[in-house]
């Protein structure tokens, strides 16, 4: 490359400033370039010749001459072919020259820029009137904002690009060849051959920029004049695109550095140039991370930049603002709008972020618009920056790493001092206690992970009154710790319910471990505020309700507050109010409709003020007349709790009472058996027991009442260790201690059992759980039978009529066959050495009193276990008998034709027979232990037997009976629930039998029921065992609330089947089988 000769040496080249060989970028041909300064005859220009010889000899005109005055910008460039380029941008083209090295590039660039600036000074274009874009920004930058800079280049950088019809380019019709012009604060798009900029974008409006290959894009927010969108442009190659990216990024960084806080003197002196307050939306406490995003640095920008041809900025003022940190990841900071939410970032920053009360925070949107602040609103605090924000880009792009810390401190997202930190304020008014947030409340964790002692109630919701003192226990085993009380319910927060500290309490929906496989929540209601520490139960009981049954049941504090409005409370687990005007009775299997005088006088269950009760099988009666109580566990075997009811399937509001159902309405026994062995079977535990057994007139020295539930395989023996949820020992402290017989005093009578937990009982359980065999999927509700072993020493004179005037000792539970039926055995033994099997299917005249055992006879307590052949019955029989120790077998001929032995039967339950049998039958054959069980069911209930037992009553002649169990009537005068199906006849329908197949049993919830309770005279008359004419409509079950007065039946008669007459203070339940097979009916008529 030739160097120009000394201008002074050559007189003819006095205006030449620089000469030399340079290459043309496209053709890469070397040409001789000459840079001439302005003179009186010509302007400063750049010329090139074919070679130096032609230029020296003036043999011809230059190939090209470019006046520097026509160039609106001169920049150094680099591309993939040439790394040292100098580009001159004119109105219609971009002329570039390529140097051999960087020093040569820099020499030429400086010479061109000097001449270009001189030309502007000579023509006094320092006000930018002749500038292409009319922007005053030069190379020196704007040290003082708003002041006119010395004459210089119009833009820091200019790139010639091809705008693509994509994004905003298409929307704004910005397509074709444009010049992308960069200043300190703006980016302008100037169309080729145009004098004015088509679009001027503030650097603060740019969310992000990047490049991909030879494409470069800029994404702007909605605060830009074009709105939110992207500009895509194509350049010569990827090197140019990368250079554009890096250069714009540097400008964005420099812009952020320029707007650091200044002194008050600077702000006051420059108040004519209003600067917006850099603010961002800030929650009163901490915004959620979704509104904070990554930390980015804020920037300010000019809001009054003019187009390249627009001349100087109006009034020489511009407005700037910072971008909110709520922009998405990888975006540039953008200005904070002056219009928006008036909420202050925090109390400590309120004044510093306000322009004398006029500034506002912009909402946390992705974009905000720049609004210049008037000069009169300028304040010293106007320059306080907002936040530390950063951004990244997609592809190869990146954004500026601008730095603009707030005056207090630059907080980092994720720390407690910044909005990124997740605090409780993010979730508003959530009343959740943080203690429970540290533990999992999923059903699995609740069911398998016992919590720490101090956190036992965290996963439960205390819905009791704040004054109550409830015991709490581990949630897995439902076993309370004795003496442990909860005094502050308000400390335990709840979800999806009303306030736990308010009164009356509401029902909470809390999922229990036993319902992890089914629906959502379980109603939890508080129990009685005063509890004996010996009671092994907790303050809460899950009633296993389903979402449609989970109502907010408001309960009153006491029955004194209850006003009788003529309705019966239908809430599950709430006992009826003891009023004499109760015209309705709950029809739910678990609703309590017992006589009111037997209710525990300590405290009565509060009921809803509107007098309604939930008609749901999920309802449960409370053992202590309280609202709810946790299911009790076996005190002797704490592990045998009811923590395994995962097999329970969802059910409707009605319970299947068909023969194929499991035991539900059974009397709550103390030993829940075979729940471990039959873990694969679905358990339908709805605990529809009307009352727990409590003998008011019981004396502690009189004896024990053993009630044990069996699931069909092995009855509870004295060394039983099987799981039990409703095992209880009534009157005795140890269910495993041997039971001794004592004399039965006739003069004593027992009240109707009201609860299963006694004052002297160390463990109680009211909710029996009996396993079922695999049934068809349709019946989803349990059956009604329980093996009740009457072993109560207290059974004195007021004992069952079959037990009257007899020393009552323990009766052995008959060991069941391994495939025995699922009906529960009720084994009520009377110690009588010579008495034959009591009331074994004996049919008596109608006028003969219903008594099972003669007062002068005794029974043997040493009955050997009765074992029969393995037959396929689904239910257990209820056995009541006074067996002699030396009985052998009952001859089959001694049994009545109606006494059906099921030794080879395939029926699903042992039928009760009502045939006439001789009083002197010595024993029963093991093959016909179903007759034994039938006789047990026949003479199951007595006046003073203490427990109410359920004997199966089948009134349906068909094999697909509907099933329901209702509560017995109230001896205090409660009216019976009206029924459309059969009348309330005082005579008990005849007990006939017939095999019923378990698979034939279907679930019918439309059956009606009648409350039948037998008065003393009516039972004594025993008019007929024929079922009433109204009982032919397909019902299976009826609960008989037996007579309320036993005064007329103090004496006992022997060998009578049917239901025994109870005492006036004992109203036991009886579920009697009236399965009317036609041949049995005809036989009964023949005998009559």
UniProtKB/Swiss-Prot annotation:
Motif (YXXM motif 3): 567-570
Protein name, as recorded: Insulin receptor substrate 1-B
SMART domains in the record: IRS (SM01244), PH (SM00233), PTBI (SM00310)
Residues bearing the modification Phosphoserine: 307
InterPro entries reported for this sequence: IRS, IRS_PTB, PH-like_dom_sf, PH_domain
Quaternary structure note: Interacts with the NPXY motif of tyrosine-phosphorylated igf1r and insr via the PTB domain. Binds to phosphatidylinositol 3-kinase p85 subunit at a low level in vitro prior to phosphorylation. Binding is greatly enhanced following tyrosine phosphorylation by insr and probably occurs via the phosphorylated YXXM motifs.
Coiled-coil segments on the chain, per record: none
Amino acid composition bias (Polar residues), ranges on this chain: 466-479, 499-516, 707-718, 840-863, 946-961, 980-995
GO CC field: cytoplasm; cytosol; intracellular membrane-bounded organelle; nucleus; plasma membrane
Region described as GRB2-binding: 785-787
Motif (YXXM motif 7): 823-826
């Amino acid at each position: 490359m030739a160097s120009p000769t000394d201008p002074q040496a050559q007189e003819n080249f006095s205006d030449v400033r620089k000469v030399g060989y340079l290459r043309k970028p496209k053709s890469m041909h070397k040409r001789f370039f000459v840079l001439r300064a302005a003179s009186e005859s010509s302007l400063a220009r750049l010329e090139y010749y074919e070679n130096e010889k032609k230029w020296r000899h003036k043999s011809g005109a230059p190939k090209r001459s470019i006046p520097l005055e026509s160039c609106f910008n001169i920049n150094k460039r680099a591309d993939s072919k040439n790394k040292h380029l100098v580009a001159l941008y004119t109105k219609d083209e971009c002329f570039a020259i390529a140097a051999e090295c960087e020093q040569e590039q820099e020499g030429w660039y400086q010479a061109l820029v000097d001449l270009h600036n001189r030309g502007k000074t000579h023509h006094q274009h320092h006000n930018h009137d002749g500038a292409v874009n009319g922007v005053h920004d030069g190379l020196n930058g704007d040290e003082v904002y708003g002041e006119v800079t010395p004459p210089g280049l119009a833009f820091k950088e200019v790139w010639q690009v091809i705008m693509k019809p994509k994004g905003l380019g298409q929307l704004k019709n910005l397509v074709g060849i444009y010049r992308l012009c960069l200043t300190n604060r703006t980016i302008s798009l100037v169309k080729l051959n145009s004098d004015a900029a088509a679009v001027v974008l503030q650097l603060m409006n740019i969310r992000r920029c990047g490049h991909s290959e030879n494409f470069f894009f800029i994404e702007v927010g909605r605060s830009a004049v074009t709105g939110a969108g992207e500009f895509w442009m194509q350049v010569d190659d990827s090197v140019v695109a990368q250079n554009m990216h890096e250069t714009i990024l540097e400008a964005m960084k420099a812009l952020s550095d320029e707007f650091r806080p200044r002194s008050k003197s600077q702000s006051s002196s420059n108040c004519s140039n209003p600067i917006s307050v850099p603010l961002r939306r800030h929650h009163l406490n901490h915004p959620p991370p979704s509104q904070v995003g990554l930390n980015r640095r804020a920037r300010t920008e000019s809001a009054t930049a003019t187009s390249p041809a627009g001349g100087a900025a109006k009034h020489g003022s511009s407005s700037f603002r910072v971008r909110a940190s709520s922009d998405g990841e990888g975006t540039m900071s953008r200005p904070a709008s002056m219009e928006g939410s008036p909420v202050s970032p925090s109390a400590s920053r309120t004044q510093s972020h306000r322009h004398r009360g006029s500034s506002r925070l912009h909402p946390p949107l992705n974009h905000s618009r720049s609004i210049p602040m008037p000069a009169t609103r300028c304040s010293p605090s106007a320059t306080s920056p907002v936040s530390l924000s950063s951004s990244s880009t997609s592809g190869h792009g990146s954004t500026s790493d601008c730095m603009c810390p707030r005056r207090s401190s630059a907080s980092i997202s994720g720390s407690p001092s910044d909005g990124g930190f997740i605090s409780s304020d993010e979730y508003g008014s959530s009343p959740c206690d943080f203690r429970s947030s540290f533990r999992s409340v999923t059903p699995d964790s609740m069911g398998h992970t016992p919590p720490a002692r101090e956190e036992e109630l965290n996963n439960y919701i205390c819905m009791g009154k704040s004054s109550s003192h409830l015991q709490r226990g581990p949630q897995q085993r439902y076993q309370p710790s004795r003496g442990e009380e909860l005094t502050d319910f308000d400390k335990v927060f709840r979800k999806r319910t009303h306030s736990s500290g308010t009164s009356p309490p509401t029902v909470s929906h809390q999922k229990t471990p036993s319902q992890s496989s089914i629906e959502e929540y379980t109603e939890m209601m508080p129990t009685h505020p005063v509890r004996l520490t010996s009671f092994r139960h907790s303050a809460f009981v899950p009633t296993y309700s389903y979402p449609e049954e989970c109502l907010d049941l408001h309960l009153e504090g006491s029955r004194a507050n209850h006003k009788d409005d003529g309705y019966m409370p239908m809430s599950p687990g709430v006992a009826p109010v003891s009023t004499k005007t109760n015209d309705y009775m709950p029809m739910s299997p678990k609703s309590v409709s017992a006589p009111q005088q037997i209710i525990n006088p300590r405290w009565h269950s509060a009921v809803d003020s509107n007098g309604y009760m939930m008609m749901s099988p999920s309802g449960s009666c409370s053992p202590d007349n309280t609202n709810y109580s946790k299911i009790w566990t076996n005190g002797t075997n704490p592990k045998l709790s009811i923590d395994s009811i995962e097999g329970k399937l969802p059910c409707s509001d009605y319970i299947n009472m068909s023969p194929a159902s499991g035991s539900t309405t059974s009397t709550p026994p103390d030993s829940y058996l075979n729940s471990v062995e039959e873990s694969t079977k679905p358990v339908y535990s709805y605990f529809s027991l009307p009352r727990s057994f409590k003998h008011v007139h019981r004396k502690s020295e009189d004896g024990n009442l053993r009630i044990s539930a069996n699931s069909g395989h092995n009855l509870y023996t004295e060394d039983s260790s099987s799981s039990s949820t409703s095992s209880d020992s009534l009157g005795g402290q140890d269910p495993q201690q041997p039971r001794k017989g004592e004399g039965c005093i006739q003069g004593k009578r027992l009240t109707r059992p009201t609860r299963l937990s006694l004052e002297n009982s160390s463990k109680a359980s009211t909710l029996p759980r009996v396993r079922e065999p695999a049934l068809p999927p349709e019946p989803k509700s349990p059956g009604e039978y329980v093996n009740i072993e009457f072993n109560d020493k207290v059974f004195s004179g007021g004992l069952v009529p079959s037990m009257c005037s007899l020393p009552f000792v323990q009766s052995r539970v008959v060991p069941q066959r391994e495939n025995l039926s699922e009906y529960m055995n009720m084994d009520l033994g009377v110690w009588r050495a010579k008495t034959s099997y009591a009331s074994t299917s004996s049919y008596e005249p109608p006028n003969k009193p219903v008594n099972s055992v003669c007062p002068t006879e005794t029974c043997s307590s040493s009955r050997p276990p009765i074992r029969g052949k393995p037959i396929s019955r689904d239910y257990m029989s209820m056995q009541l008998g006074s067996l002699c120790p030396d009985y052998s077998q009952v001859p089959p001929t001694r049994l009545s034709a109606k006494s059906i032995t099921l030794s080879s039967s395939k029926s699903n339950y042992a039928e009760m027979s009502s045939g006439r049998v001789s009083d002197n039958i010595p024993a029963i054959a093991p093959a016909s232990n179903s007759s034994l069980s039938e006789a047990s069911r026949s003479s199951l209930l007595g006046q003073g037997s203490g427990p109410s037992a359920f004997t199966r009553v089948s009134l349906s002649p068909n094999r697909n009976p509907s099933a329901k169990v209702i509560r017995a009537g109230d001896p205090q005068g409660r009216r019976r629930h009206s029924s459309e199906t059969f009348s309330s006849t005082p005579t008990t329908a005849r007990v006939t039998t017939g095999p019923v197949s378990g698979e034939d049993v279907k679930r019918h919830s439309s059956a009606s029921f009648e409350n039948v309770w037998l008065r003393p005279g009516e039972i004594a008359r025993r008019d007929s065992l024929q079922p009433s004419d109204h009982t032919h409509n397909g019902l299976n079950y009826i609960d008989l609330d037996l007579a309320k007065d036993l005064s007329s039946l103090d004496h006992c008669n022997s060998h009578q089947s049917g239901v025994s007459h109870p005492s006036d203070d004992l109203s036991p339940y009886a579920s009697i089988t009236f399965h009317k097979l036609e041949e049995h009916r005809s036989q009964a008529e023949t005998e009559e």
